């Protein structure tokens, strides 16, 4: 029976490349001369450092533009609060989302059931498995989910026939 998984996962290699490109641009830009602006990564947690809130906004803009160039959806980023760290310096923690949250998984299952397409959706950990008898039904579910779920980037993988 054909099936596929609905997941929400960023390509961490591309995220790392975007951070390296951002740091390179920040180190060469004239408006960051002499400042301690940078972006650091620890697993799925990015930390943006800058001299003040305005420069922190500039650092985030550079990071977002580099991620967009590397085809990493910026909806994966979850911005934390801006914290002061001694003097005028500030930092902000940015978390890269992973997995389909419980609320989103329930929403996806409800959308699939309400669509009246002959498929079954089940929550399996941080993914949603959609199973049906026809491949065409699965393709119509993918099209429907891409249209209806716009607040979170969804990937479809693990296709089985």
Curated annotation (Swiss-Prot):
Tagged with keyword Nucleotide-binding: yes
CDD domains given in the database record: YajQ_like
Keywords, alphabetical: Nucleotide-binding
Chain coiled-coil ranges: none
Keyword check for Nucleotide-binding: yes
Molecular function as annotated in GO: nucleotide binding
Assigned GO CC terms: cytosol
NCBIfam families, A to Z: PRK05412.1
Similarity comment: Belongs to the YajQ family.
HAMAP family: YajQ (MF_00632)
Function: Nucleotide-binding protein.
Record's protein name: Nucleotide-binding protein Bphy_0527
């Amino acid at each position: 029976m054909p099936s596929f998984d609905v997941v929400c996962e960023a390509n961490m290699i591309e995220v790392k490349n975007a951070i390296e490109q951002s740091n390179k641009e920040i180190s060469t830009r004239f408006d960051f001369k002499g400042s301690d602006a940078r972006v650091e990564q620890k697993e799925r947690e990015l930390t943006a450092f800058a001299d003040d809130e305005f420069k922190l906004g500039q650092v985030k803009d550079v990071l977002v533009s580099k991620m967009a160039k590397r085809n990493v959806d910026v909806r994966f980023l979850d911005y934390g609060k801006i914290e002061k760290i001694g003097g005028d310096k500030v930092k902000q923690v940015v978390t890269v989302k992973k997995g389909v949250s419980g609320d989103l998984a329930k929403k996806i299952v409800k959308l699939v059931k309400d669509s009246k397409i002959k498929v079954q959706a089940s929550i399996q950990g941080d993914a949603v498995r959609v199973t049906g008898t026809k491949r065409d039904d699965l393709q119509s579910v993918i099209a429907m989910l891409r249209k209806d779920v716009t607040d979170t980037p969804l990937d479809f993988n693990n296709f089985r026939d």
